[in-house]
Amino acid sequence: KETAAMKFQRQHMDSGSSLSSSSDYCNKMMKVRNMTQESCKPVNTFVHESLQDVQAVCFQENVTCKNGQQNCHQSRSNMHITDCRQTSGSKYPNCLYQTSNMNRHIIIACEGNPYVPVHFDASVEDST
């Protein structure tokens, strides 16, 4: 069975590529990572950093999650991410996405022992 930590890696980790070079990236990745099977997942973020670096965020600044839970953490540094958003005209099973590359701080929820990422909460721009 897929654990929450495994699901996080499937849905949000893409360490292999530093940035999604093609506009087709989200269309391909959302399909390959099984996020268009029963419906189109409307929004998803991929992180192009090493799993080690993303797991380390669990021990960085503690912030409140969007849902009010207290187990979210914000990355100290910017990370290369790709935001995938479903385009307005696309309908299941033909899920189409808009690909946006960004460099932002990520906010993830962590839990368990070992304490690992289980949910991608948000990304934020530098507050400077």
UniProtKB/Swiss-Prot annotation:
Keywords: Disulfide bond, Endonuclease, Glycoprotein, Hydrolase, Lyase, Nuclease, Secreted. Substrate binds at K7, R10, K41, P42, V43, N44, T45, K66, R85. One of its GO terms (biological process) is defense response to Gram-positive bacterium. It catalyses: an [RNA] containing cytidine + H2O = an [RNA]-3'-cytidine-3'-phosphate + a 5'-hydroxy-ribonucleotide-3'-[RNA]; an [RNA] containing uridine + H2O = an [RNA]-3'-uridine-3'-phosphate + a 5'-hydroxy-ribonucleotide-3'-[RNA]. It is found in: Secreted. Glycans are attached at N34. SMART domains: RNAse_Pc. It comes from the Eukaryota. It holds the Pfam family RnaseA. SUPFAM superfamilies: RNase A-like. The active site is at H12, H119. InterPro entries: RNaseA, RNaseA-like_dom_sf, RNaseA_AS, RNaseA_domain. Its main location: secreted. Pancreas. Residues 1-20 are annotated as: Disordered. Its EC number is 4.6.1.18. Monomer. Interacts with and forms tight 1:1 complexes with RNH1. Dimerization of two such complexes may occur. Interaction with RNH1 inhibits this protein. Belongs to the pancreatic ribonuclease family. Endonuclease that catalyzes the cleavage of RNA on the 3' side of pyrimidine nucleotides. Acts on single-stranded and double-stranded RNA. PANTHER family: RIBONUCLEASE (PTHR11437), RIBONUCLEASE PANCREATIC (PTHR11437:SF24). This is Ribonuclease pancreatic. The gene is RNASE1.
